[in-house]
Curated annotation (Swiss-Prot):
PANTHER family in the cross-refs: ATP-DEPENDENT CLP PROTEASE ATP-BINDING SUBUNIT CLPX-LIKE, MITOCHONDRIAL, ATP-DEPENDENT CLP PROTEASE ATP-BINDING SUBUNIT CLPX-LIKE, MITOCHONDRIAL-RELATED
Binding positions (Zn(2+)): 8, 11, 33, 36
PROSITE patterns xrefs: CLPX_ZB
Gene that encodes the chain: clpX
Organism this protein belongs to: Helicobacter hepaticus (strain ATCC 51449 / 3B1)
Protein name as it appears in the record: ATP-dependent Clp protease ATP-binding subunit ClpX
Length: 426
């Protein structure tokens, strides 16, 4: 008669030479294996070593007002006023909620709040063309609030079991951005770009991954709605013998972004062409972009996002395509404007860099023509400046002027040796 092998009551593994199983000593039919015993011991050690003061510090995130948050966005993001207002309110409410939920009953400033009401979080969906400022807004406020941020592309994510990146790896990136501090990561921001590319109706289909995109959406739903997730601290695929870190996603702010090409058609069909200014017009890209401000959750479901995911993205706002005038401002006005960055680089080597107005406008026109938005400005600048940058160490004491011809026709810029200002002695 074969002896029945014992199984671990926690992981259901059979007893083996390298994984012995012991009885609990209390209940006859309850067993625990060596692996689960080690994991349990590590978890208990973590709880015993917790420093309550550190936990409180992790929760104590500064919460500037929505006006202060928008003012910070105004320093780096040109235009998009409505989107910046909505985003600022959403971020303010999110971190105010975390602070309120962490207060004890005695710490509540108002007796009305002492009623066991727990505030739920509102994640954000930003709809707008490539290079319109979606990622920059999230990065700017994360830096301002001194919280970690992880940025992922939804097109690289796959359902468990397919070739590609596990959805949980987003949280691994966030943990790494928090320098391994779990508590800090649990109050961070996750930005998922190109969320529209994993719609159930996506044309980008492949036999090597979930063809509908719904599996990836379901996997995202689990972490977005708030749950405790086991992640490998160094990323990669999960396997039974590796160590995991537990992250609670309940207080992580998820921001999703996408261009949603074709969404305007869905909105127009729903409205029946009864929107002022669109009835009887010839369809164009500008018309579709203008229609996006009328977007409703049902339109996004028709586009191919699952209702459960839309139900977790409570704050929806749209960003407009960037005009030529706005593109020129992006190049020159923000604190970290590209023109200012290049001028700083030249200053370090003792040279002075000037851009003629026509040159800046030409850069903006090229970015619009390439349909890359503000994101494409740097590559245009790099292409136009590469030869000059190569010679830069020998240009100390020169004034260099970039003209329209330098940008459009690759002509060499004007280089003039600066005159030394020698004062005569009296």
């Amino acid at each position: 008669m074969n002896e029945i092998k014992k199984r671990c009551s926690f992981c259901n593994k059979e007893e083996s030479l390298d994984n012995p199983i012991i009885n609990s000593g209390i209940t006859p039919d309850v067993y625990i294996c060596n692996y689960c015993l080690i994991v349990g011991s590590e978890i208990l050690t973590g709880y015993l070593n917790k420093n309550p003061q550190q936990d409180q510090e992790a929760i104590d995130i500064k919460t500037p007002s929505p006006k202060e948050l928008k003012a910070k966005l105004d320093e780096y993001v040109i235009g998009q006023d409505e989107a910046k207002r909505v985003f600022s309110v959403a971020v303010y409410n999110h971190y105010k909620r975390i602070k309120a939920n962490s207060l004890s009953e005695e710490e509540m400033p108002n007796p009305i709040l002492q009623d066991d009401v727990e505030l739920s979080k509102s994640n954000i969906l930003l709809i707008g063309p490539t290079g319109s400022g979606k990622t920059l807004m999230a990065q700017t406020l994360a830096r301002f609030l001194d919280i970690p941020i992880a940025i992922s592309d939804a097109t690289s994510l796959t359902e468990a079991g397919y070739v590609g990146e596990d959805v949980e790896n987003i949280l691994t990136r966030l943990l790494q951005a928090a320098d391994g501090d779990v508590k800090k990561a649990e109050k961070g921001i996750v930005f998922i770009d190109e969320i529209d590319k994993i719609s159930r109706l996506s044309e980008n289909r492949s036999i090597t991954r979930d063809v509908s995109g719904e599996g990836v959406q379901q996997a995202l739903l689990k972490i977005i709605e708030g749950s405790v997730v086991n992640i490998p601290p160094k990323g990669g695929r999960k396997h039974p013998n590796q160590e995991f870190v537990q992250i609670n996603t309940s207080d992580i702010l998820f921001v999703c972004g996408g261009a949603f090409d074709g969404l305007g058609d869905i909105i127009k069909r729903r409205l029946g062409g009864n929107v002022l200014g669109f009835h009887g017009e010839k369809k164009g890209k500008s018309e579709e972009d203008a229609l996006l401000k009328y977007v409703e959750p049902d339109d996004l479901i028709s586009y191919g996002l699952i209702p459960e995911l839309i139900g977790r993205l409570h704050m929806i706002t749209t960003l407009s395509p960037i005009s030529k005038e706005a593109m020129v401002e992006i190049l020159t006005k923000p604190k970290n404007a590209l023109i200012k960055q290049y001028q700083k680089i030249f200053e370090i080597d003792g040279a002075t860099l000037h851009f003629e107005k026509d040159a800046i406008e030409s850069i903006a026109e090229l970015a619009i023509a390439r349909k890359t938005g503000a994101r494409g400005l740097r590559s245009i600048m790099e292409g136009a400046m590469i030869d000059l940058m190569y010679d830069l160490p020998e240009l100390a004491g020169y004034e260099i002027t970039i003209s329209k011809e330098c940008i459009m026709d690759k002509q060499s810029p004007l280089r003039v040796k600066k005159k030394r200002n020698i004062q005569k002695r009296a």
